[in-house]
Amino acid sequence: MKYELKTTSGNARRGRLTFSRPKGEYVVETPAFMPVGTYGTVKGMTPEEVAATGAQILLGNTFHLWLRPGQEVMKSHGDLHGFMQWHGPILTDSGGFQVFSLGKLRKIKEEGVTFQNPISGEKIFLSPEKSMEIQYDLGSDIVMIFDECTPYPATFDYAKNSMEMSLRWAKRSRDRFDELQNPRALFGIVQGGTYEELRKISAEGLVDIGFDGYAVGGLAVGEPKEEMHRILEFTTPLLPQDKPRYLMGVGKPEDLVEGVRRGIDMFDCVMPTRNARNGHLFVSNGIVKIRNAKYKTDTTPLDPECDCYTCKNYTKAYLYHLDKCGEILGARLNTIHNLRYYQRLMAQIRQAIEEDRFDDFVVEFYAKIGKEVPPLQSEVNK
């Protein structure tokens, strides 16, 4: 993987990732949003439909694919690309967040994590080394180190111990990745909770080990938005300028804008797909809740500014009808629209950075959705 930083507008960065894959070179324009394909599918969508929304890279879930269908099935198809028939780049998370999500079902030790398989109930063990081996078999283009996602709230001592263990796990991940002679990219993950001092130690420790890119983890786990913005604004300047920066598990459209304002290049979130299935649809001026009875007879498209298949062909009344009847097509059309909304937003962001008018774009974006522009920490401190 090669990263090229092309231009900036304030702290916003316009870049390009290039991946060499068996079917040729693949380019990902950044800032980029990655749809989530937890079980080897973006729910309800074919790979061709996902690509048609403008997505250039997907996220797969190491933990879930390891449990089902397992490494052997994956290897029998070549890798995850062959299994799901997506031939562009794939980033896989390490399983750390899923382990964090299991709560009482897991036990964390220095060696790794023992937990109860949520499918079969048996005890299984996941370590930094095992995570690197699974991701190698998945053929991931971007491999994530195995870490502990520090919960919120966490005391300073808990966050410190968790971050220090994640740093040791980062080194073990790096070593096993190199032993496997994996030709792909490996990203480190900054932890440290909401404590700037710990974030600094984590970022510096990861840079010392050396990675192809750096993620900011442990955010969007329940902390107030202001806290997320503060930690993000503090952390990104600590990361190398010439490497991509990834904000994990974020988020709402305004979260993407705020991440880019603070120097982030990559995002992923289940929000556009999950919200689509629940009738929450993102449009240029906010959100349409398609289950509202006022749309029952609405003959207008979802978003007149949108060029997706759904908006070009169907009315709100039809989408309301499909949702009311529980038709699968409704969820699919909603998903197509929400994913396209996110990709259009990223394209608009990239263009604004190229034209060095990103600050103006931010003002216009918030004006459209009827919200105030959140201040940057640097502005608050003046």
Swiss-Prot record:
Family listed: Belongs to the queuine tRNA-ribosyltransferase family.
Region (RNA binding): 249-255, 273-277
Catalysed reactions listed for this entry: 7-aminomethyl-7-carbaguanine + guanosine(34) in tRNA = 7-aminomethyl-7-carbaguanosine(34) in tRNA + guanine
Alphabetical UniProt keywords: Glycosyltransferase, Metal-binding, Queuosine biosynthesis, Transferase, tRNA processing, Zinc
Pfam families per the UniProt record, alphabetical: TGT
CC annotations in GO: cytosol
Gene3D superfamilies membership: Queuine tRNA-ribosyltransferase-like (3.20.20.105)
Any one GO MF annotation of this record: metal ion binding
Reported function: Catalyzes the base-exchange of a guanine (G) residue with the queuine precursor 7-aminomethyl-7-deazaguanine (PreQ1) at position 34 (anticodon wobble position) in tRNAs with GU(N) anticodons (tRNA-Asp, -Asn, -His and -Tyr). Catalysis occurs through a double-displacement mechanism. The nucleophile active site attacks the C1' of nucleotide 34 to detach the guanine base from the RNA, forming a covalent enzyme-RNA intermediate. The proton acceptor active site deprotonates the incoming PreQ1, allowing a nucleophilic attack on the C1' of the ribose to form the product.
Protein name: Queuine tRNA-ribosyltransferase
Binding locations of Zn(2+): C306, C308, C311, H337
A single BP term in Gene Ontology: queuosine biosynthetic process
Positions annotated to bind substrate: D93, S94, G95, G96, F97, D147, Q191, G218
EC class name: transferase
This protein's pathway: tRNA modification; tRNA-queuosine biosynthesis
Active-site residues annotated for this sequence: D93 (proton acceptor), D268 (nucleophile)
Co-factor note (free text): Binds 1 zinc ion per subunit.
Subunit structure of this chain's protein: Homodimer. Within each dimer, one monomer is responsible for RNA recognition and catalysis, while the other monomer binds to the replacement base PreQ1.
